[in-house]
Design a protein with these regions (language model features):
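Hydrophobic positions on the alpha1 helix immediately C-terminal to the Walker A/P-loop
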Residues: 139
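Non-catalytic substrate-recognition and accessory regions of acyl/acetyltransferase enzymes
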Residues: 1-131, 142-147
């Protein structure tokens, strides 16, 4: 295996984590930014400072906190979130009954979505030539209290 593609020891990775309330809808949406660094990947220009090897951006969504504005809030953020919201929820942020009905539902959604936060991952980026095939993002999100 090429030295550039050697798997990194993921136990040595460090995570920096930021949660920022949304400017317009802080009760319903929070931005999540997760950056992963590894001690073997250092900048040659800035005093050997660790450089990021991977990034994750996501939203924490609280549908239950939106009152009757859930779909409008999702629509104001992005087309992707609007489509997600309109597919699964009503305007009050409640999961559509057709998805949880025992006879009609698909069996993987339940009424617990009416009172739980949702982590919607928007983007994951990994530096080229970094082998992180077994990288467990949820490990870092859990460590920082997101899950």
């Amino acid at each position: 295996m090429s030295p550039l593609l050697q798997p990194l020891d993921l136990t040595q990775c460090k995570a920096s984590f930021e949660v920022e309330p949304h400017d317009e809808h802080p009760r319903v949406l929070e931005h999540i930014f997760l950056t992963i660094t590894h001690p073997l990947r250092r900048s040659k220009r800035v005093a050997h400072q660790p450089i990021p090897i991977a990034w994750l951006t996501a939203f924490r969504i609280r549908p239950y906190a939106a009152n009757a504005e859930f779909l409008a809030i999702m629509d104001s953020e992005s087309d992707e979130l609007q489509q997600f919201g309109a597919t699964l929820f009503d305007r009050y942020g409640k999961i559509k009954s057709t998805l949880v009905d025992g006879r009609k539902g698909n069996g993987c959604w339940g009424p617990e979505l009416n009172r739980q936060d949702i982590i919607y991952i928007m983007d994951v980026e990994v530096e080229p030539n970094v082998c992180v095939s077994s990288f467990d993002w949820s490990m870092f999100l859990h460590d920082f209290g997101v899950f």
